[in-house]
């Protein structure tokens, strides 16, 4: 499904449209609810790309409306005090060590204030919308993460954005910590794409930014700053 948006060949699109419509009608007749839902969701991909008087996709898509994938309301990205708070989990391995150092340097400019504790850092925006980024130091995987989680719990905060930074075999640890009100989860480890279903099982409405193959700090860190 994620490849459909890049297809521009009109003949290929026509074939795909026909296949989706055929399967939807077939599964509907067979009373296959799950299969029908899958092709109903796929019909959304063709609503704005339909040709001539092909209104079938629009009528089916209304039954399987999808939320926006590339936009989140600002109100959902802040706590009750209008501050957006992030929690970034680093792990004690060679990847975590290099990534943490690069991560902190990314925010070393006049727009941000870096508060350095012995086991974690807090990065705060100096202008614009208030943002606070909490990250444990990679060498303090256990006590640093526990301390930050304690700070959030004591203040009744939710991490609006959660980020996993470390090898993929640590990803499950971060995924298990997803809060009900977390809106964005960034999974930058290699092959993070394979963990999408696990994340969705934890929170069905969460927006996910994930690497497909190789995760690199040279992409992840600048991207986090842009968020």
What are these regions (language model features)?
Residues 13, 17, 69, 73-74, ...:
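Extracytoplasmic/secreted envelope proteins and their assembly/folding machinery
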Residues 155-227:
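Catalytic cores of nucleophile-dependent amide-cleaving enzymes
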Residues 48-62, 131-139, 153-163, 180-181:
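Acidic/glycine-enriched edge-of-secondary-structure segments
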Residues 82-83, 128, 157, 165:
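Extracytoplasmic
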Residues 74, 85-94, 135-142, 184-188:
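Second-shell loop/turn segments in exported
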Residues 80, 115, 125-127, 179, ...:
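A generic structural signal for short, solvent-exposed coil/turn residues
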Residues 95-97, 108-154:
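Functional beta-strand-loop-alpha-helix junction segments that form "active/interaction loops"
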Residues 1-110, 116-120:
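Non-catalytic propeptide/linker segments at domain boundaries
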């Amino acid at each position: 499904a994620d490849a459909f948006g890049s297809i521009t060949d009109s003949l290929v699109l026509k074939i795909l449209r026909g296949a989706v419509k055929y399967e939807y009608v077939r599964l509907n007749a067979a009373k296959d609810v799950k299969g029908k839902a899958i092709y109903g969701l796929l019909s959304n991909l063709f609503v704005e790309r339909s040709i001539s008087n092909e209104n079938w996709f629009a009528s089916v898509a209304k039954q399987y409306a999808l939320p926006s994938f590339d936009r989140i309301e600002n109100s959902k990205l802040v706590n009750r005090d209008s501050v957006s708070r992030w929690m970034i989990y680093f792990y004690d391995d060679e990847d975590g060590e290099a990534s943490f150092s690069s991560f902190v340097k990314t925010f070393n400019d006049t727009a941000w204030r870096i508060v350095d504790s012995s086991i974690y850092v807090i990065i705060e925006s100096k202008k614009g919308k208030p943002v606070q980024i909490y990250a444990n130091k990679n060498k303090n995987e256990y006590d640093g993460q526990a301390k930050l989680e304690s700070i959030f719990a004591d203040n009744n905060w939710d991490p609006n954005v959660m980020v996993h930074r470390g090898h993929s075999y640590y990803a499950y640890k971060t995924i298990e910590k997803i809060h009900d009100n977390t809106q964005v989860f960034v999974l930058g480890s290699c092959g993070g794409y394979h963990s999408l279903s696990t994340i969705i099982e934890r929170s069905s409405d969460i927006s996910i930014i994930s690497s497909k193959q190789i995760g690199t700090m040279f992409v992840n860190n600048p991207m986090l700053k842009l968020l």
